[in-house]
Amino acid sequence: LNPGDEFSFNKIVGERTPEKGYQSAIVYQTGGKSEAEAGGGVCQVASTIYTACLYADLKVTERAPHMFTVTYVQLGMDATIYWGSLDYKFVNSTDHPMRIDASVSGGYVHIKLVGTAPKDKGYDHIVLRHEVVATVQPKMEIDGDKTIITDAGTALDENGNTVNIVVDKDGNKYIKGDMVQYSYVGKTVMAYRDYV
């Protein structure tokens, strides 16, 4: 990646399809749904590149967080991508060419940005700090007949899929139509601020 060149995840990786060997895994979709789709989970790679870019102090030109928190990086360190709508992009904002080395081992994605570190930055290294600035409880809505509360929260089923939890007027909780015998407290969503 030459100085001033922009990296686009979607342009480099291309569309994720079964024909290209991408397996099906869960993706977050518009409206809060999560469904299996070819290339699901590839956001983990985009998020790892994003983190590397932050530590390298490169200029990020396009990045969007997921609609839900993810577990594979700290809050605010994720980068979601979706073919045709969401991309992750950054610019080589150094004065020297750089390359991206990517590998997988032991179930982990490793990203190295290899290049010449600028000498005029005035610091030796970068520390990322996270601060929770607010928490928001799960949204609840009562349907027309006031018997079902929807969007009471989400949970992961035995396959790792996100499922909605429905609570009836008596406080009974259901997941995928089956009554569950345990209490569930919905995950809170946290607003955060990142510092570089």
Segments and roles (model prediction):
Residues L1-V196:
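Well-ordered beta-sheet/strand-loop patches within structured domains
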